[in-house]
Amino acid sequence: MMKKFLYVILGVLFLSSCRSNLYVLPSLPPETSVADSIRLVDTEITSSKAGSGYRGISRVRTYKFSHPDVPAAFDGFRIAFISDLHYKSLFKEKGLENLVRLLNDQRADALLVGGDLHEGCEYVAPVISALAAVKVSMGTYMVLGNNDYEACYADIVRQLEAHNIHLLEHRVDTLKRDGAEILIAGVRNPFNLQKNGVSPTLALSPDDFVILLTHTPDYAEDVAITNTDLVLAGHTHGGQVTLFGLYA
């Protein structure tokens, strides 16, 4: 069996509105990664190792994302994004505790989670309970990964509902602040579309600022999702390799 090499990426994004021509960014295609988005707006990226202070967290990256559709009320809005915990495989209990501490230290307004929470049904409750302990003023939003659909799906849904964590399965939620709003759209993992019969299309207004949350970037090849401005995806564990056109 091929050995898994796993690390957790935590990204903290600062949204800002910008009106100068230099920063005007058209709606991005779904396959555009968050890193591509950052480069397109010519913003600074800082990266730091978080080994000693937060053991178990391999990489922390901070992005400032400027876009003309971000309402002024959301200037400085902080989003924390994590994905692929695969608890309790290589990511252990102490690492999970440190992740929660690190997330709380970021003082994010919203937490977005990209799926693949666990490596066993017995770990569903503790990992979701830990994520529920992250303090965010505007909620935690999640899509599920292929691992989550393969096992314990019903239990995951129950646990998320019990902890008031928003599961986005072809759904759009609205975040409101001072009369303005941004949208968070979430889609199901593409490996499961055919068997679950969920419509793969989300129609979103080009006038809204839309964050698309998906487990895998391969989703862009299978569904029609238009007018998204920022795409956050997991699954690839820091890289993307495909063979013969198959999913990574």
Model-assigned labels for residue ranges:
Residues 2-78:
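Acidic, histidine-bearing metal-coordination/catalytic regions of metal-dependent phosphoesterases
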Residues 86, 117-118, 147-148, 172-173, ...:
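Catalytic metal-binding/acid-base residues of hydrolase active sites
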Residues 76-86, 181-190, 211-215:
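Active-site-proximal beta-strand elements of phosphoester/diester hydrolases
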Residues 177-179, 195-196, 240-247:
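Short, charged, surface-exposed secondary-structure boundary motifs
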Residues 40, 52, 64-66, 129-193, ...:
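Extended active-site neighborhood of metal-dependent phosphoesterases/phosphodiesterases
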Residues 56-58, 70-166:
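Membrane-embedded segments
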Residues 132, 217-248:
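Conserved beta-sheet core of the metallophosphoesterase superfamily
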Residues 203-212:
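Short beta-strand/loop segments at the ligand-binding rim of alpha/beta enzyme cores
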